[in-house]
Amino acid sequence: MLRKTPFLDGRNPPLLVHCGYHKVGTVWFARILGRVGSRYGLKVQRGMRVRGNKVTPPLPDTGIFIDPHSRAEGNTLPPFKGSHMVRDPRDMVISGYFYHKWTTERWVRMPGRMDGKDWGRSDWRGWTYHDILNSVDQEEGLAIEIHRASAGVLHRINSWDYDDPRFHEMQYRNVIADEDAAFATMFTHYGFTPKAVERSVEMAREFSFKNVTKRDVGEKSRGKSHLRSGQPGEWSQYFTGEHRKLFEEINPGLMVKLGYEISADW
């Protein structure tokens, strides 16, 4: 008889929670967890932003809760097992810069959305973020993206509690380096049986970068794509000395805290 539940303790299954960030594999993980949820009868819910930095809570029948912006507060959730993934914030800046130059996401095309920002210019009042980035050269555009990201997603990354044992911490660079091992560890943390871990890793493999894009990691898309190159460390090809200085000034110690650098002098 086929065992439906993936959990070692099938009578007391925890809520599964995955927290990520924009441009840090949120679509990738949603596809994987959606497939796993479908296989094992676990309802998947995507957390939606509500007032301020809050997120909609999981419903009573939710089995897998995906928070794409890491706004969920662990102490407000029912008993859970979670995963949380970060990416080199500098690569997030590069990925975000190129993506925001062409995406049709509503906020990027909303006139005046960037009004009042301390890094903005008075003649940009009423402009869309898309138009701002496309009106300046790459060097200035990356500086703008550093400012914007630092006030939002990078602030949340810096504020995250990395010592919460309920969350399995993951780094994009390590997942890309060995996807099978990374996902096996994640599903084991979730409390899956060895067989369920094996099956879930097989499902995750279907959504690997190469299988989805038909490109190797590091090979850039020829056109507009949500998945650009996937190569860790790409920031070093684009950051100038001024970009490095600006990033560290706004986000002091973040790269050392996350383990990407050993000192602030990078």
Segments and roles (model prediction):
Residues 1-170, 230, 242-266:
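PAPS-dependent sulfotransferase catalytic domain
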